[in-house]
Regions:
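Hydrophobic alpha-helical segments and their boundary regions
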Residues: 18, 52-55, 75, 95
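Short, non-ligating residues that shape and space the ligands of small metal-coordination modules
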Residues: 59-60
Length: 115
């Protein structure tokens, strides 16, 4: 009986550790996503000033030169490509924005338009 209590206690302690680590990892992933959204919004509104040309309700922009991003359904890879290389009259941002900034603004637009 004592052996059984010991095994249950050991199992319980291991489960507590697993649950704690799992919770911590989930919490970190939310923090990472929030920081990427924050950087993406900063790049969209300030550094690249995407809203001058594009409408995106989440960013409060009402540009009418480029496509209304709220009406588009892009994949992340398409957004990264367009921001990096430019498309039509949109200039390329490679060399002006870091890859981290390009990825963040793409993530921001993707998350804001794919709900």
């Amino acid at each position: 009986m004592i052996r059984l209590k010991f095994l249950v206690q050991q199992f319980s302690n291991k489960m507590k550790k697993i649950i704690f680590v799992s919770f911590f990892l989930v919490l970190c992933s939310f923090a990472s996503a929030d920081s990427k959204m924050g950087l993406g919004l900063e790049v969209y509104n300030n550094k690249a000033q995407c809203g001058v040309c594009h409408t995106l309700q989440a960013a409060g922009s009402v540009g009418d030169i480029g496509p209304n991003l709220d009406q588009m359904n892009f994949q992340m890879s398409q957004i990264i490509y367009a921001v990096t290389n430019g498309i039509g009259v949109m200039p390329p941002w490679e060399g002006i924005l870091s890859y981290e900034e390009i990825e963040a603004v793409a993530y921001y637009v993707f998350q804001s338009t794919n709900k």
